[in-house]
Amino acid sequence: MDFREILMIASKGQGVNNVPKRYSLAVGPPKKDPKVKGVQSAAVQAFLKRKEEELRRKALEEKRRKEELVKKRIELKHDKKARAMAKRTKDNFHGYNGIPIEEKSKKRQATESHTSQGTDREYEMEEENEFLEYNHAESEQEYEEEQEPPKVESKPKVPLKSAPPPMNFTDLLRLAEKKQFEPVEIKVVKKSEERPMTAEELREREFLERKHRRKKLETDGKLPPTVSKKAPSQKESVGTKLSKGSGDRHPSSKGMPLPHAEKKSRPSMANEKHLALSSSKSMPGERIKAGSGNSSQPSLREGHDKPVFNGAGKPHSSTSSPSVPKTSASRTQKSAVEHKAKKSLSHPSHSRPGPMVTPHNKAKSPGVRQPGSSSSSAPGQPSTGVARPTVSSGPVPRRQNGSSSSGPERSISGSKKPTNDSNPSRRTVSGTCGPGQPASSSGGPGRPISGSVSSARPLGSSRGPGRPVSSPHELRRPVSGLGPPGRSVSGPGRSISGSIPAGRTVSNSVPGRPVSSLGPGQTVSSSGPTIKPKCTVVSETISSKNIISRSSNGQMNGMKPPLSGYRAAQGPQRLPFPTGYKRQREYEEEDDDDDEYDSEMEDFIEDEGEPQEEISKHIREIFGYDRKKYKDESDYALRYMESSWKEQQKEEAKSLRLGMQEDLEEMRREEEEMQRRRAKKLKRR
């Protein structure tokens, strides 16, 4: 084929290709689906029936499955209950010691199990029914709840007020002119700060609270105290009982009315130190005047268990030690008592030689309350009437001249710091004598005193068990040769043991600490701020365990005391304070220093009326734990002492952040160090 022919063929093909193929763009007629008119064919009907049946079957299956699940659930629930009950009873049998398990005969057991099975089945059925009903009710409720919202929506909607038309510019200007000089009120939204309060803020808040409380108390205090009316009758009964014939023994007036009275007076008198003065003045009619010289009168016969107040507000007990029948000692005592009385009040003491009760225990300086039962306030609360420590139940043998010595007696003296007193810290002395000791409230000079040498064992354990002397200040001893000023009373807080010639210490309690005696002849001044007249077994056992029975000069119980001059030289032996009480001690020393009412000390003894007191007292004695340690912490601080989970997480995050920062800094430092070293190495090269 030659070249020309090829070109010819190519040119022919070119012409054919030039005409493009085109599809018609005209829209054709619409295609209509042929619709079957009238009844559907049999095949279609059969198909539809089959579908419906399937749906119905599925629904039934679903229902059955649900019921089965519910049944299983109930069974499980029941099993769980039964298992838990079984476990509980099994476990608890350790606690039921002494309850015998009844052995049942096999027949009986079989019948019981049969009945129990029946009851179980019934129970299951009931529970199932209940559950189904409950489910039904629940689903109905849910359904109703679902249906209700649309009803709420279907209420005719109140058409929203259309926005006011926008103002003209001229109107706006006019309004601006008007409002230009009016002050704009900006509402300050207070942000409640979450940060904890600072110590100063806390102090301020506490101070305000205290003020408020004081005002309340003052308003309450204006109401006359009702309880103290019980006192005179009690005292009289004690007096008359003690003055009966010398042979009879009797239980001296049982302190039973005390607790009830205490309960009554507590609410009204809690924290009422500042009412001490007014209350003591308010009942002048109840003070029984003692006969001037008749120390054998019944009123003075009770004297052995009354603290003697020598007007300066310091009671000392009329308890005498049996082992010293010497007149010289009793004379020094008498002269000391007289000297004290002359100093403080114009009441002359008509006491005869021999340790006896001076009339001052009735006529005291105003504001000094006699501690004890008449006001029947909890020890540590101001007593209102004239009061004496009651002799708590126990047979009291009679002694010569009608003065009985109370063996297992407790004299509770509620001594709280009177505020405007001539002497801020009254020390109370428990007037108890050992079983063999007469408290000779009257006795001629040098009258021999019968009885064993089992003297009252002093245990001034007001600070901690085993400390011989409880008063935080030194106990000054009288020197028998020195005559009237044999008692060196230096300052308000000194205890006066001069009234006791024999050298048995009478435990002097710290202000606000009552003195109680437990057991025959054991004087235990209590360690807590409150003591109830009833003494529990626990306290007795504790006191007998922990306490070293020796008088304050360190001598043991049976030994004769050395001469008082020697005693003065030797000085009292004292154990160190347990650390738990340091804070309290500081408070008490502050108390001694200032005579005026101290607002800070207003709530010194706070938790008086609580039934916890006995328990906490024993806990304190055993463990040295003091609940009052956190007393001056505010409620706020105590509440937030334990942090919440959120706060803990915050702290964690904070510490983590700080830790990471520290790590980064350390790494940076290390890098810098490395660079420095490298630079040094390069320089050396």
Curated annotation (Swiss-Prot):
<keyword id="KW-0539">Nucleus</keyword>
<comment type="similarity">
    <text>Belongs to the SPT2 family.</text>
</comment>
<feature type="compositionally biased region" description="Basic and acidic residues">
    <location>
        <begin position="666"/>
        <end position="676"/>
    </location>
</feature>
<feature type="modified residue" description="Phosphoserine">
    <location>
        <position position="278"/>
    </location>
</feature>
<feature type="region of interest" description="Disordered">
    <location>
        <begin position="644"/>
        <end position="685"/>
    </location>
</feature>
<feature type="compositionally biased region" description="Low complexity">
    <location>
        <begin position="542"/>
        <end position="553"/>
    </location>
</feature>
<feature type="region of interest" description="Important for interaction with histones">
    <location>
        <begin position="571"/>
        <end position="685"/>
    </location>
</feature>
<feature type="compositionally biased region" description="Low complexity">
    <location>
        <begin position="317"/>
        <end position="330"/>
    </location>
</feature>
<feature type="compositionally biased region" description="Basic and acidic residues">
    <location>
        <begin position="101"/>
        <end position="111"/>
    </location>
</feature>
<keyword id="KW-0804">Transcription</keyword>
<keyword id="KW-0238">DNA-binding</keyword>
<feature type="coiled-coil region">
    <location>
        <begin position="645"/>
        <end position="685"/>
    </location>
</feature>
<feature type="compositionally biased region" description="Low complexity">
    <location>
        <begin position="435"/>
        <end position="501"/>
    </location>
</feature>
<dbReference type="GO" id="GO:0140713">
    <property type="term" value="F:histone chaperone activity"/>
</dbReference>
<dbReference type="GO" id="GO:0042393">
    <property type="term" value="F:histone binding"/>
</dbReference>
<feature type="compositionally biased region" description="Acidic residues">
    <location>
        <begin position="587"/>
        <end position="613"/>
    </location>
</feature>
<dbReference type="GO" id="GO:0003677">
    <property type="term" value="F:DNA binding"/>
</dbReference>
<dbReference type="Pfam" id="PF22878">
    <property type="entry name" value="SPT2_N"/>
</dbReference>
<feature type="compositionally biased region" description="Basic and acidic residues">
    <location>
        <begin position="260"/>
        <end position="275"/>
    </location>
</feature>
<comment type="function">
    <text>Histone chaperone that stabilizes pre-existing histone tetramers and regulates replication-independent histone exchange on chromatin. Required for normal chromatin refolding in the coding region of transcribed genes, and for the suppression of spurious transcription. Binds DNA and histones and promotes nucleosome assembly (in vitro). Facilitates formation of tetrameric histone complexes containing histone H3 and H4. Modulates RNA polymerase 1-mediated transcription. Binds DNA, with a preference for branched DNA species, such as Y-form DNA and Holliday junction DNA.</text>
</comment>
<feature type="region of interest" description="Important for interaction with DNA">
    <location>
        <begin position="1"/>
        <end position="570"/>
    </location>
</feature>
<feature type="modified residue" description="N6-acetyllysine">
    <location>
        <position position="582"/>
    </location>
</feature>
<dbReference type="InterPro" id="IPR054552">
    <property type="entry name" value="SPT2_N"/>
</dbReference>
<keyword id="KW-0832">Ubl conjugation</keyword>
<dbReference type="Pfam" id="PF08243">
    <property type="entry name" value="SPT2"/>
</dbReference>
<feature type="compositionally biased region" description="Low complexity">
    <location>
        <begin position="365"/>
        <end position="385"/>
    </location>
</feature>
<feature type="compositionally biased region" description="Basic and acidic residues">
    <location>
        <begin position="644"/>
        <end position="655"/>
    </location>
</feature>
<dbReference type="InterPro" id="IPR013256">
    <property type="entry name" value="Chromatin_SPT2"/>
</dbReference>
<feature type="compositionally biased region" description="Polar residues">
    <location>
        <begin position="416"/>
        <end position="431"/>
    </location>
</feature>
<feature type="coiled-coil region">
    <location>
        <begin position="45"/>
        <end position="81"/>
    </location>
</feature>
<dbReference type="GO" id="GO:0006334">
    <property type="term" value="P:nucleosome assembly"/>
</dbReference>
<feature type="cross-link" description="Glycyl lysine isopeptide (Lys-Gly) (interchain with G-Cter in SUMO2)">
    <location>
        <position position="187"/>
    </location>
</feature>
<dbReference type="GO" id="GO:0031507">
    <property type="term" value="P:heterochromatin formation"/>
</dbReference>
<keyword id="KW-0175">Coiled coil</keyword>
<feature type="region of interest" description="Disordered">
    <location>
        <begin position="188"/>
        <end position="615"/>
    </location>
</feature>
<keyword id="KW-0805">Transcription regulation</keyword>
<feature type="cross-link" description="Glycyl lysine isopeptide (Lys-Gly) (interchain with G-Cter in SUMO2)">
    <location>
        <position position="37"/>
    </location>
</feature>
<dbReference type="GO" id="GO:0006355">
    <property type="term" value="P:regulation of DNA-templated transcription"/>
</dbReference>
<feature type="modified residue" description="Phosphoserine">
    <location>
        <position position="599"/>
    </location>
</feature>
<dbReference type="GO" id="GO:0005730">
    <property type="term" value="C:nucleolus"/>
</dbReference>
<keyword id="KW-0597">Phosphoprotein</keyword>
<feature type="region of interest" description="Disordered">
    <location>
        <begin position="79"/>
        <end position="168"/>
    </location>
</feature>
